Amino acid sequence: NGRISNESPLGMALLVVALCGILLPLSYGMSMGWTSPIILGGFAIGIVFTVLFIKYESGADQPIIPVKLFRNRNYLAFVLVGFICYFYRGAMDVYSPLGAINVMGTSNGVAGALQFPRTIVTMFLPVIAGAWVGKKTANMWKALAITTALSAFPMLAMGFTTPTTSVLLYFIALTITGVAESYRGVSITPAAQACLKPEDIGIGTALINFANSLSCSLAAAIFGMIYSGFTVADPTNVANIQNGVNTVFLTAGAITVVGLVLVLFWVRPMLEEQAGEDIVSV
Protein backbone atom coordinates (compact mmCIF):
# COMPACT_ATOMS: atom_id res chain seq x y z
CA ASN A 1 0.00 0.00 0.00
CA GLY A 2 2.98 2.27 -0.42
CA ARG A 3 3.68 2.18 3.33
CA ILE A 4 6.86 1.00 5.01
CA SER A 5 6.34 -2.16 7.03
CA ASN A 6 7.09 -1.83 10.73
CA GLU A 7 8.36 -5.42 10.64
CA SER A 8 11.43 -4.32 8.69
CA PRO A 9 14.61 -4.31 10.80
CA LEU A 10 15.90 -1.30 8.87
CA GLY A 11 14.57 1.24 11.37
CA MET A 12 16.27 -0.48 14.28
CA ALA A 13 19.51 -0.82 12.30
CA LEU A 14 19.51 2.90 11.44
CA LEU A 15 18.91 3.79 15.08
CA VAL A 16 21.72 1.54 16.33
CA VAL A 17 24.23 2.94 13.82
CA ALA A 18 23.16 6.53 14.62
CA LEU A 19 23.59 6.05 18.37
CA CYS A 20 26.89 4.20 17.99
CA GLY A 21 28.16 6.93 15.68
CA ILE A 22 27.55 9.50 18.40
CA LEU A 23 28.21 7.64 21.65
CA LEU A 24 31.43 5.85 20.67
CA PRO A 25 33.28 9.02 19.59
CA LEU A 26 32.16 10.70 22.82
CA SER A 27 33.58 7.78 24.79
CA TYR A 28 36.92 7.49 22.96
CA GLY A 29 37.47 11.04 21.74
CA MET A 30 39.63 11.99 24.70
CA SER A 31 41.98 9.01 24.38
CA MET A 32 42.19 8.98 20.57
CA GLY A 33 42.10 12.75 20.05
CA TRP A 34 39.12 14.81 18.91
CA THR A 35 40.74 15.51 15.55
CA SER A 36 41.29 11.81 14.84
CA PRO A 37 39.77 10.81 11.48
CA ILE A 38 38.08 7.88 13.22
CA ILE A 39 36.41 10.15 15.79
CA LEU A 40 35.36 12.74 13.21
CA GLY A 41 34.14 9.98 10.92
CA GLY A 42 32.11 8.50 13.76
CA PHE A 43 30.35 11.80 14.40
CA ALA A 44 29.67 12.20 10.68
CA ILE A 45 28.17 8.71 10.51
CA GLY A 46 26.05 9.42 13.57
CA ILE A 47 24.64 12.63 12.10
CA VAL A 48 23.97 11.13 8.66
CA PHE A 49 22.24 8.05 10.06
CA THR A 50 20.20 10.18 12.48
CA VAL A 51 18.81 12.10 9.50
CA LEU A 52 18.15 8.85 7.62
CA PHE A 53 16.45 7.37 10.66
CA ILE A 54 14.12 10.36 11.04
CA LYS A 55 13.18 10.25 7.36
CA TYR A 56 12.55 6.50 7.54
CA GLU A 57 10.47 6.78 10.71
CA SER A 58 8.30 9.49 9.17
CA GLY A 59 6.95 6.94 6.67
CA ALA A 60 6.69 3.88 8.91
CA ASP A 61 3.35 2.33 9.89
CA GLN A 62 4.37 1.87 13.52
CA PRO A 63 7.63 3.77 13.98
CA ILE A 64 10.13 3.02 16.70
CA ILE A 65 10.13 6.73 17.54
CA PRO A 66 6.87 8.45 16.55
CA VAL A 67 8.17 11.64 14.95
CA LYS A 68 4.69 13.15 14.77
CA LEU A 69 4.53 13.38 18.56
CA PHE A 70 7.32 15.95 18.54
CA ARG A 71 4.90 18.35 16.87
CA ASN A 72 2.95 18.32 20.14
CA ARG A 73 4.59 21.19 22.01
CA ASN A 74 3.22 20.18 25.40
CA TYR A 75 4.32 16.58 25.06
CA LEU A 76 7.77 17.67 23.87
CA ALA A 77 8.20 19.77 27.01
CA PHE A 78 7.67 16.77 29.27
CA VAL A 79 9.97 14.55 27.21
CA LEU A 80 12.77 17.14 27.49
CA VAL A 81 12.27 17.60 31.23
CA GLY A 82 12.19 13.84 31.72
CA PHE A 83 15.39 13.48 29.69
CA ILE A 84 17.12 16.06 31.86
CA CYS A 85 15.81 14.54 35.10
CA TYR A 86 17.53 11.26 34.26
CA PHE A 87 20.84 12.82 33.26
CA TYR A 88 22.26 13.32 36.76
CA ARG A 89 21.94 9.61 37.54
CA GLY A 90 25.00 8.86 35.42
CA ALA A 91 27.02 11.02 37.79
CA MET A 92 25.36 9.70 40.92
CA ASP A 93 25.71 5.98 40.18
CA VAL A 94 29.34 5.99 39.02
CA TYR A 95 31.14 9.00 40.46
CA SER A 96 29.73 9.22 43.98
CA PRO A 97 31.43 5.95 45.06
CA LEU A 98 34.51 6.98 43.09
CA GLY A 99 34.71 10.27 44.96
CA ALA A 100 34.00 8.63 48.31
CA ILE A 101 36.71 6.00 47.91
CA ASN A 102 39.46 7.79 45.98
CA VAL A 103 39.04 11.36 47.25
CA MET A 104 37.56 11.06 50.74
CA GLY A 105 39.30 7.76 51.48
CA THR A 106 36.24 5.86 52.71
CA SER A 107 35.96 2.08 52.61
CA ASN A 108 34.27 0.13 49.84
CA GLY A 109 31.52 -0.84 52.27
CA VAL A 110 30.66 2.76 53.07
CA ALA A 111 30.75 3.72 49.39
CA GLY A 112 28.47 0.82 48.54
CA ALA A 113 25.93 1.98 51.13
CA LEU A 114 25.70 5.55 49.83
CA GLN A 115 22.38 4.99 48.06
CA PHE A 116 20.78 2.87 50.77
CA PRO A 117 18.86 5.77 52.40
CA ARG A 118 17.86 6.95 48.92
CA THR A 119 16.42 3.53 48.15
CA ILE A 120 14.31 3.58 51.31
CA VAL A 121 12.92 7.01 50.40
CA THR A 122 11.98 5.86 46.89
CA MET A 123 10.13 2.87 48.33
CA PHE A 124 7.64 4.85 50.41
CA LEU A 125 7.51 8.51 49.34
CA PRO A 126 6.00 7.98 45.83
CA VAL A 127 2.68 6.94 47.41
CA ILE A 128 2.43 10.23 49.30
CA ALA A 129 3.76 12.27 46.38
CA GLY A 130 1.33 10.64 43.96
CA ALA A 131 -1.66 11.41 46.18
CA TRP A 132 -0.60 15.06 46.42
CA VAL A 133 0.06 15.45 42.70
CA GLY A 134 -3.31 13.97 41.84
CA LYS A 135 -5.26 16.55 43.85
CA LYS A 136 -5.03 19.30 41.22
CA THR A 137 -3.29 20.13 37.94
CA ALA A 138 -1.21 22.93 39.48
CA ASN A 139 0.59 20.40 41.66
CA MET A 140 2.01 18.78 38.54
CA TRP A 141 4.42 21.61 37.72
CA LYS A 142 5.29 21.94 41.40
CA ALA A 143 6.24 18.25 41.45
CA LEU A 144 8.43 18.78 38.39
CA ALA A 145 10.05 21.80 40.02
CA ILE A 146 10.76 19.74 43.14
CA THR A 147 12.19 16.98 40.95
CA THR A 148 14.63 19.22 39.10
CA ALA A 149 15.59 21.38 42.07
CA LEU A 150 16.24 18.44 44.40
CA SER A 151 18.30 16.74 41.70
CA ALA A 152 20.35 19.82 40.81
CA PHE A 153 21.33 21.19 44.21
CA PRO A 154 22.72 17.92 45.65
CA MET A 155 24.87 17.49 42.54
CA LEU A 156 26.16 21.05 42.86
CA ALA A 157 26.96 20.47 46.54
CA MET A 158 28.86 17.28 45.71
CA GLY A 159 30.81 19.23 43.10
CA PHE A 160 33.05 20.67 45.83
CA THR A 161 34.37 17.40 47.22
CA THR A 162 37.80 17.49 48.88
CA PRO A 163 39.77 14.91 50.91
CA THR A 164 38.47 16.59 54.09
CA THR A 165 34.80 16.46 53.04
CA SER A 166 32.65 14.27 55.27
CA VAL A 167 31.04 11.32 53.54
CA LEU A 168 27.87 12.40 55.33
CA LEU A 169 27.49 15.05 52.61
CA TYR A 170 27.12 12.31 50.01
CA PHE A 171 24.61 10.40 52.13
CA ILE A 172 22.47 13.51 52.61
CA ALA A 173 22.76 14.64 48.99
CA LEU A 174 21.83 11.25 47.55
CA THR A 175 18.94 10.89 49.99
CA ILE A 176 17.59 14.22 48.74
CA THR A 177 17.77 12.91 45.17
CA GLY A 178 15.54 10.08 46.39
CA VAL A 179 12.87 12.69 47.12
CA ALA A 180 13.39 14.07 43.62
CA GLU A 181 13.07 10.61 42.09
CA SER A 182 9.85 9.98 44.01
CA TYR A 183 8.23 13.10 42.55
CA ARG A 184 9.61 12.42 39.09
CA GLY A 185 8.05 8.99 38.99
CA VAL A 186 4.54 10.30 39.67
CA SER A 187 4.64 13.41 37.48
CA ILE A 188 6.55 13.11 34.20
CA THR A 189 4.77 10.15 32.61
CA PRO A 190 1.21 11.05 33.72
CA ALA A 191 1.69 14.66 32.58
CA ALA A 192 2.99 13.57 29.18
CA GLN A 193 0.18 11.04 28.74
CA ALA A 194 -2.40 13.73 29.45
CA CYS A 195 -1.17 15.61 26.37
CA LEU A 196 -1.77 12.69 24.01
CA LYS A 197 -4.72 11.24 22.15
CA PRO A 198 -5.86 7.86 23.50
CA GLU A 199 -4.43 6.01 20.48
CA ASP A 200 -1.00 7.62 21.03
CA ILE A 201 -0.63 6.93 24.75
CA GLY A 202 1.07 3.55 24.35
CA ILE A 203 3.73 4.63 21.88
CA GLY A 204 4.07 8.01 23.60
CA THR A 205 4.85 6.31 26.89
CA ALA A 206 7.39 4.09 25.14
CA LEU A 207 9.06 7.21 23.73
CA ILE A 208 9.40 8.67 27.21
CA ASN A 209 11.12 5.47 28.36
CA PHE A 210 13.38 5.60 25.31
CA ALA A 211 14.32 9.21 26.09
CA ASN A 212 15.18 8.22 29.65
CA SER A 213 17.41 5.37 28.44
CA LEU A 214 19.05 7.65 25.88
CA SER A 215 19.70 10.19 28.62
CA CYS A 216 21.57 7.59 30.69
CA SER A 217 23.66 6.53 27.67
CA LEU A 218 24.59 10.09 26.72
CA ALA A 219 25.34 10.95 30.33
CA ALA A 220 27.70 7.99 30.67
CA ALA A 221 29.58 9.02 27.52
CA ILE A 222 29.77 12.72 28.39
CA PHE A 223 30.73 12.23 32.03
CA GLY A 224 33.32 9.64 31.03
CA MET A 225 34.79 12.13 28.58
CA ILE A 226 34.94 14.84 31.26
CA TYR A 227 36.49 12.58 33.89
CA SER A 228 39.05 11.17 31.47
CA GLY A 229 40.08 14.69 30.53
CA PHE A 230 41.29 15.27 34.09
CA THR A 231 42.73 11.83 34.85
CA VAL A 232 44.29 10.74 31.55
CA ALA A 233 47.72 12.07 32.57
CA ASP A 234 47.75 10.18 35.90
CA PRO A 235 44.64 8.13 36.77
CA THR A 236 45.87 7.49 40.33
CA ASN A 237 46.55 11.11 41.28
CA VAL A 238 44.05 12.17 43.96
CA ALA A 239 43.98 15.79 42.79
CA ASN A 240 43.17 14.70 39.24
CA ILE A 241 40.43 12.37 40.47
CA GLN A 242 39.02 15.13 42.67
CA ASN A 243 38.91 17.61 39.78
CA GLY A 244 37.35 15.03 37.49
CA VAL A 245 34.67 13.96 39.96
CA ASN A 246 33.81 17.53 40.92
CA THR A 247 33.50 18.65 37.31
CA VAL A 248 31.19 15.73 36.57
CA PHE A 249 28.93 16.65 39.49
CA LEU A 250 28.91 20.35 38.60
CA THR A 251 28.05 19.52 35.00
CA ALA A 252 25.21 17.25 36.11
CA GLY A 253 23.91 19.96 38.43
CA ALA A 254 24.10 22.66 35.76
CA ILE A 255 22.21 20.53 33.23
CA THR A 256 19.51 19.79 35.79
CA VAL A 257 19.20 23.52 36.57
CA VAL A 258 18.32 23.94 32.90
CA GLY A 259 15.48 21.50 33.54
CA LEU A 260 14.30 23.63 36.46
CA VAL A 261 14.28 26.71 34.22
CA LEU A 262 12.22 24.81 31.62
CA VAL A 263 9.72 23.83 34.29
CA LEU A 264 9.34 27.37 35.64
CA PHE A 265 9.15 29.21 32.33
CA TRP A 266 7.65 26.64 29.95
CA VAL A 267 5.85 23.87 31.80
CA ARG A 268 4.34 26.02 34.55
CA PRO A 269 2.56 28.52 32.22
CA MET A 270 1.42 25.63 30.04
CA LEU A 271 -0.15 23.71 32.94
CA GLU A 272 -1.68 26.84 34.47
CA GLU A 273 -3.28 27.65 31.13
CA GLN A 274 -4.57 24.09 30.89
CA ALA A 275 -6.00 24.30 34.42
CA GLY A 276 -7.78 27.54 33.50
CA GLU A 277 -9.32 25.93 30.42
CA ASP A 278 -10.53 23.00 32.52
CA ILE A 279 -12.26 25.38 34.95
CA VAL A 280 -13.94 27.27 32.10
CA SER A 281 -15.17 24.04 30.51
CA VAL A 282 -16.68 22.92 33.81
Which residue ranges define each predicted feature?
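Hydrophobic transmembrane-helix bundles of small-molecule transporters
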Residues: 1-81, 88
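Short alpha-helical interface patches
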Residues: 11-14, 53, 169, 182, ...
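12-transmembrane solute porter fold
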Residues: 37-38, 62-232, 242-271
